C-alpha cells in the first residue's frame, strides 16, 4: 500500500488527480495520516521499529508508543485539516458498533482514534480490548458520493499471505516497489489489479473476497463480544479465583501459539 500512496502523492503534486477524502483502518489509518502530513517516509521507520520490537518481544505493545512519538511531530492545528477529510474506522465491542470517526477535537483525539483502529487483541496490548471496548476497524469506510479508489490489502489469499510473510526482508523497499507497480498498472490499463480498483468497477473475484471478508469480520467481532461478556459473567462465580488461573494459562498458551506462528513469517 505504501508504494501505491507514494505514486498517488506524486500524481497529486503534479495536479494529475485530486484527493478529497481518505478512509482507512488499522495500518491503513496510519498511512492515511502520513499521506496528509506529506511524510510517507516515516512509514519505513515505523515498519523497522515494529519488526525489530516483535523479533525481541513477540508482540507489538510498542505500537501505542510509536503513535505517541508520531503525535509529537504533528503541527498544532493539523487535526483541523482532517475533519471531514480523514475517516478512521474501528469497532466498539461493548456497543457492538462499527464506528467511523471523521471529526476530531485535537491532535491527541486524532491519534487516539488511530490507536483504536490499530488494536489487535493481545498482539497490540496485554488486554482483549483497547480501553475496555475498542478493537481494529478491519475494513475501511466507503464513500458513496465520490469516485472511490480502494487499495485492498486483502484482495485474495496471495496478498494476505504476502502481507504477513516478511521473514527474509531487511526493509520494505520491495513492497514499496510492488505497490507502485500495481497502481501504475491500474492507471495504465484502467482495469482492476490485485490491490487497486474503483469500488463501482469491481470484478466478481474482488466482490467475492470482499464479501467473504465482511462475513469473517461479523463473526470475529461477535466472537470477541461473546468472550468479553463471558469473562464478566465468570467473575461473579464463587470459584472465580480458580477459573482465573485457568484463564491466565489459556491466555499464555494462545499468546505463545500466536507468537510461534507469526515468528515463522516475521523473524
Name each region found by the language model:
Residues 1-22, 33-267:
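Patatin-like phospholipase
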Residues 26:
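Catalytic nucleophile serine of serine hydrolases
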Amino acid at each position: 500500500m505504501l508504494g501505491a500512496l507514494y505514486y498517488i502523492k506524486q500524481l497529486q503534486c503534479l495536479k494529475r488527480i485530486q484527493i478529497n477524502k481518505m478512509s482507512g483502518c488499522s495500518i491503513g489509518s496510519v498511512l492515511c495520516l502520513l499521506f496528509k502530513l506529506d511524510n510517507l517516509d516515516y512509514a519505513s521507520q515505523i515498519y523497522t521499529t515494529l519488526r525489530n520490537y516483535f523479533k525481541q518481544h513477540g508482540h507489538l505493545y510498542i505500537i501505542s508508543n510509536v503513535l505517541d512519538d508520531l503525535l509529537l511531530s504533528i503541527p498544532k492545528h493539523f487535526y483541523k485539516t482532517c475533519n471531514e477529510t480523514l475517516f478512521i474506522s474501528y469497532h466498539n465491542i461493548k456497543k457492538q458498533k462499527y464506528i467511523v470517526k471523521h471529526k476530531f477535537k485535537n491532535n491527541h483525539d486524532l491519534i487516539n482514534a488511530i490507536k483504536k483502529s490499530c488494536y489487535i487483541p493481545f498482539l497490540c496490548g496485554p488486554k482483549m480490548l483497547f480501553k475496555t471496548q475498542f478493537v481494529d476497524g478491519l475494513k475501511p469506510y466507503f464513500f458513496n458520493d465520490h469516485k472511490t479508489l480502494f487499495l485492498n490489502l486483502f484482495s485474495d489469499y496471495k496478498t494476505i499471505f504476502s502481507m504477513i510473510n516478511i521473514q527474509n526482508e531487511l526493509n520494505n523497499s520491495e513492497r514499496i516497489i510492488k505497490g507502485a507497480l500495481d497502481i501504475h498498472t491500474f492507471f495504465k490499463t484502467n482495469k482492476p489489479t490485485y490491490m487497486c480498483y474503483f469500488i463501482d468497477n469491481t470484478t466478481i473475484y474482488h466482490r467475492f473476497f470482499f464479501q467473504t471478508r465482511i462475513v469473517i469480520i461479523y463473526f470475529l467481532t461477535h466472537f470477541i463480544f461473546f468472550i468479553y461478556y463471558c469473562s464478566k459473567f465468570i467473575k461473579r462465580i464463587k470459584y472465580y479465583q480458580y477459573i482465573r488461573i485457568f484463564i491466565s494459562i489459556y491466555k499464555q498458551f494462545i499468546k505463545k501459539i500466536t507468537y510461534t506462528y507469526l515468528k515463522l513469517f516475521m523473524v
